[in-house]
Amino acid sequence: MKNTLFALGLTAVSATVAADPKSCSSLLDLDVRRLAGDETVNLCEAYQGQVILIVNTASKCGFTPQYEGLEALYRKYRDRGFVVLGFPSNDFANQDPGSEEEIQKFCRLTYSVEFPMFEKVGVKKGRAAPLFERLAAAGAPYPKWNFYKYLIDRNGNLVDHYISTTGPESAKVVKAIEKLLSFQDSK
């Protein structure tokens, strides 16, 4: 009887630890630099417990207007624990050739971007930044173009990914975000 109770107690503790959004996911446990600045942020420490949409961005792409939809999602859901994290990249057809300062200015002036933006990075296989290497190791493809999106749950697990043609305000993306937010809201 004691062994059974001990095993049940151990199982309950293990389940609690596994579901604890405060524990750091290896996917997000890395430091990145804010766009056009010197401040370094540990993604796990800064965003653990939140639903995250990671996006590789570009300023001169046919999909660049998606900044508007990304910002709209961020503003709509941020108070419920949702954040968009943008990572500019010049890996595709030289569509983000500017300096980080130019990219930051473009995002703010053209699309009023308030969601966190980080350093310009490589995203292609073989030269991808550590975050994109980890996303690939978690089962997502490397971006094949600008504005690939990666949805991460509150525990830091990759839930889904979306190609460039799937807009941030598409029913598919919104439904997935709302499901993750509602799951936590119902606890």
Question: Residue locations for each model-derived region?
Answer:
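A short beta-strand-turn-helix
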Residues: 30-51, 74-77
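Thiol-/selenol-based redox modules, centered on thioredoxin-like
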Residues: 130-133, 137-187
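Cleaved targeting-peptide boundary
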Residues: 19-25
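Hydrophobic h-region of N-terminal signal peptides that target proteins for export
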Residues: 9-18
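Positively charged n-region of N-terminal signal peptides that target proteins for export
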Residues: 1-4
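Amphipathic alpha-helical repeat scaffolds
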Residues: 56-60
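Conserved hydrophobic packing residues within short motifs/helices of P-loop NTPase cores
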Residues: 52-55, 85
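Structural microenvironment flanking redox-active thiols in thiol-disulfide oxidoreductases
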Residues: 63-128
